[in-house]
Amino acid sequence: AKLSTEDLLEQFKGLTLIELSEFVKAFEETFEVGAAAPV
């Protein structure tokens, strides 16, 4: 299912900072990018 930007932001609002950092790490591993890389 494709989420809109608003849906994603609502999901992130419910996360803790630890959960967010874990998500970013998993995202980088999945897409082989760094957080500073343009998407």
From Swiss-Prot:
InterPro entries: Ribosomal_bL12_oligo (IPR008932), Ribosomal_bL12_oligo_N_sf (IPR036235)
GO molecular function: structural constituent of ribosome
Entry superkingdom: Bacteria
BP GO annotations: translation
Gene Ontology CC terms, in alphabetical order: ribonucleoprotein complex; ribosome
Keyword Transmembrane: no
Matches recorded under Gene3D superfamilies: Single helix bin (1.20.5.710)
A family per Pfam: Ribosomal_L12_N
Keyword annotations from UniProtKB, A to Z: Ribonucleoprotein, Ribosomal protein
Role summary: Forms part of the ribosomal stalk which helps the ribosome interact with GTP-bound translation factors. Is thus essential for accurate translation.
Record-stated family: Belongs to the bacterial ribosomal protein bL12 family.
The protein's assembly and partners: Homodimer. Part of the ribosomal stalk of the 50S ribosomal subunit. Forms a multimeric L10(L12)X complex, where L10 forms an elongated spine to which 2 to 4 L12 dimers bind in a sequential fashion. Binds GTP-bound translation factors.
Name this protein carries in UniProt: Large ribosomal subunit protein bL12
